[in-house]
Amino acid sequence: MKRFLCGVLAALMLVVLCACGKQETATVRLSEVTHSVFYAPQYVALEQGFFADEGLNIELTNGGGADKVMTAVLTGQADIGLAGPEACIYVYNQGKDDYPVVFGQLTKRDGSFLVGREDVPFSWELLRGKTVIGGRAGGVPEMTLEYVMRQNGVVPGTDATVDTTVQFNMMAGAFTGGNGDFVTLFEPTATEVAQAGKGYILASIGQESGEIPYTAYFASQAYISDHADIVQRFTNAIARAQKWIAEHDAAQTAEIIAPQFPDMSVPVLTQVVQRYKDIDAWNATPVMTRSSLERLETVMETAGVLDHADWVDFDRLVDNSYAHNAS
């Protein structure tokens, strides 16, 4: 009898220990700037269960632009935002105390492609005297486009017109509707326009721009402070996905993320993933470097939206501790 009771007690203790060791599931409301193959590592983390392994339930919404993602984070409608870190710079320079802080980087160059109306050998000189639908003024896509144009001797506003009046998620529709001569589009939209016979992919903006912290994860300081464990678990999942995508080819990646893009065939999705692999779009780890942030601020200064005196110190805007712990 005594031996039986000891066995029962041991079993109960094992159950209690297992229950104590089990991680509580937490829900994270994540607002992404757009739903694009450009963010493939994030979808790998979702589809491979990397977030679930960290005890996280992700509620993903499409913010439809960096400004809208930032608004969602600032108003508490989203816990974490995925957008260009320029949004954090703008908020910091507005003097807000609880300005959002970047804790992880996903992409390291522009993920948009220049789409034109004719299938011709591309030269930036083709833009002279033409109109390019470039996105919202002050957004990283528009600023990077202008930076690349200047780098190639085409001055926006003088040699070519950059239309900044069209909302980010309306750019493809505006172009296929007859506006502009060129447009910058992310995947899968660029390929969808090309497949519809409404345009031709001519150039990669990111290949021309060099490395910048194009898309990153950020949250309010209050959220990070109150939910440090969740932020670490989130970053762990992203780091694991970045490693996974580096070790697998485009076809394998396309198979995994296909549920996120139900309107695309796997062969076309494979082609799109390969296009991003070819331009080295994704970070190897979530760590952001000081030099890359400074290049972004250079792009912003060149675009006329940031004075040099208003550059934000790296250590104020970026907390790499979670990324280092995850990598």
What is each stretch, according to the model?
Residues 1-27, 325-327:
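Short, low-complexity disordered leader/linker segments with a strong preference
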Residues 36, 93-99, 137, 155-159, ...:
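Short, charged helix-to-loop "capping" segments that act as catalytic/coupling loops
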Residues 225-307:
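Secondary-structure end/capping motifs
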Residues 87, 167-261:
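Pocket-lining segment of extracytoplasmic ligand-binding domains
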Residues 44, 50, 148, 192, ...:
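Residues within well-ordered alpha helices
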Residues 78-81, 176, 276-290, 321-327:
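Short amphipathic alpha-helical segments at helix boundaries and their inter-helical linkers
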Residues 26-167, 174, 181-187, 198, ...:
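Short, glycine-/small- and polar/acidic-enriched structural segments
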Residues 297-327:
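Conserved C-terminal helix/tail region of periplasmic/extracytoplasmic solute-binding proteins
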